[in-house]
Amino acid sequence: RQMCIRDRPGARVLDLYAGSGQLGIEALSRGAARCVFLDENREAVNIVMKNCKNCGVFDRSRVNIGEAARFLSACREQFDLVLLDPPFRGGTLEKILPAVEKCVAPGGIVLCESETGIVLPAQTGSLTLQKQYKYGKVLLWKYTKPMQSAAEQEGEAL
């Protein structure tokens, strides 16, 4: 996680299922331009706001309460780094990953965290699985979006 976050200075970050905001705050502390945090739990949202203030990154943060699927369907922004750390069990990650694609900027990265035993696709839309890491009972999935769409690449080849 830290390597991917560190390599994105100036990034626009989306931290879905923010929890305490740890991942997004880490990105901001390593040079991300701004971070949008989302969690559906009011207590978690209050904790994220408090943590952003305590860490001195509140001015580069936008903290929202709401359901991830609804947020993504209405989202008109694109992000360079999307962090997905939903609650384990329940199939949340498998359901939400396809909806994330439209919010990922060309050349963007999606980092997903899950429990072991989960199987995610090697490709979902324009997102391609680059690496999978295992840390004890946790899996980290790194997806990337190409700088150009396949249609744009074909057009240049002609």
Predicted regions: what they are:
Residues 2, 6-158:
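Class I S-adenosyl-L-methionine-dependent methyltransferase catalytic core
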